[in-house]
UniProtKB/Swiss-Prot annotation:
It comes from Gallus gallus (Chicken). Gene3D superfamilies: 1.10.287.90, Cupredoxins - blue copper proteins. Component of the cytochrome c oxidase (complex IV, CIV), a multisubunit enzyme composed of 14 subunits. The complex is composed of a catalytic core of 3 subunits MT-CO1, MT-CO2 and MT-CO3, encoded in the mitochondrial DNA, and 11 supernumerary subunits COX4I, COX5A, COX5B, COX6A, COX6B, COX6C, COX7A, COX7B, COX7C, COX8 and NDUFA4, which are encoded in the nuclear genome. It is a multi-pass membrane protein. SUPFAM superfamilies: Cupredoxins, Cytochrome c oxidase subunit II-like, transmembrane region. It catalyses: 4 Fe(II)-[cytochrome c] + O2 + 8 H(+)(in) = 4 Fe(III)-[cytochrome c] + 2 H2O + 4 H(+)(out). This is Cytochrome c oxidase subunit 2. The lineage of its organism: Eukaryota, Metazoa, Chordata, Craniata, Vertebrata. GO terms for cellular component: mitochondrial inner membrane; mitochondrion; respiratory chain complex IV. Cu cation A2 binds at C195, E197, C199, H203. The chain crosses the membrane at residues 15-45, 59-86. CDD domains: CcO_II_C (cd13912).
Length: 227
């Protein structure tokens, strides 16, 4: 999760998030190159090494037409690739349904007969020492590590949004409509998210907690809750 005064992304814990971080760095390098070029040209103008009386420069016009096109291609190609990856739904090992309410989440493990629960934020007065304020819940989502997970997302009342930054996931929860997303966790851990669509007075009290565990631990947990 994010640390105090952190300026960058959270540690990537899924292949999609790793791609997003790489694309962010790539876009920043392109922006840095553009800013450097503009600064260089401004410096030349201020030092009067470039004439402001030029009325015709076919070569310059050709350059400032081709160069932006190249920049756009450099940004568009990796962006389109990531968009395709984010929309692609692999054959999942586990399907989870998330239903947004004012102001809590309901989760249903559709591959199991009787495995569903409501997930409420843990009140500050009940937080154990060392836990995170406004981010902990009474029931976490538990998923197997390194397994394709599909999440079907909807809402029961108003618009919500199911978002977990470390996994690179953010999908709107819309009443009467099913949206879906997928991800794979690359390491064990606990990943925090929140509802990312303003949904009323207690919008900030809808945390999401995903716990990624080895398969045998997930099987033990699911057997315990199903029994």
């Amino acid at each position: 999760m994010a640390n105090h005064s952190q300026l960058g992304f959270q540690d990537a814990s899924s292949p999609i998030m790793e791609e997003l971080v790489e694309f962010h760095d790539h876009a920043l390098m392109v922006a840095l190159a553009i800013c450097s070029l503009v600064l260089y040209l401004l410096t030349l103008m201020l030092m009067e090494k470039l004439s402001s009386n030029t009325v015709d420069a076919q070569e310059v016009e050709l350059i400032w037409t081709i160069l932006p096109a190249i920049v756009l291609v450099l940004l568009a190609l990796p962006s389109l690739q990531i968009l395709y990856m984010m929309d692609e739904i692999d054959e999942p090992d586990l399907t989870l349904k998330a239903i947004g309410h004012q102001w809590y989440w309901t989760y249903e493990y559709t591959d199991f007969k009787d495995l569903s629960f409501d997930s409420y934020m843990t009140p500050t007065t009940d937080l154990p020492l060392g836990h995170f304020r406004l981010l902990e819940v009474d029931h976490r989502i538990v998923i197997p590590m390194e397994s394709p997970i599909r999440v079907i997302i909807t809402a029961d009342d108003v618009l919500h949004s199911w978002a977990v930054p470390a996994l690179g996931v953010k999908t709107d929860a819309i009443p009467g409509r099913l949206n879906q997303t997928s991800f794979i966790t690359t390491r064990p851990g606990v990943f925090y998210g929140q509802c990312s669509e303003i949904c009323g007075a207690n919008h900030s009290y809808m945390p999401i907690v995903v716990e990624s565990t080895p398969l045998k631990h997930f099987e033990a947990w699911s057997s315990l809750l199903s029994s």
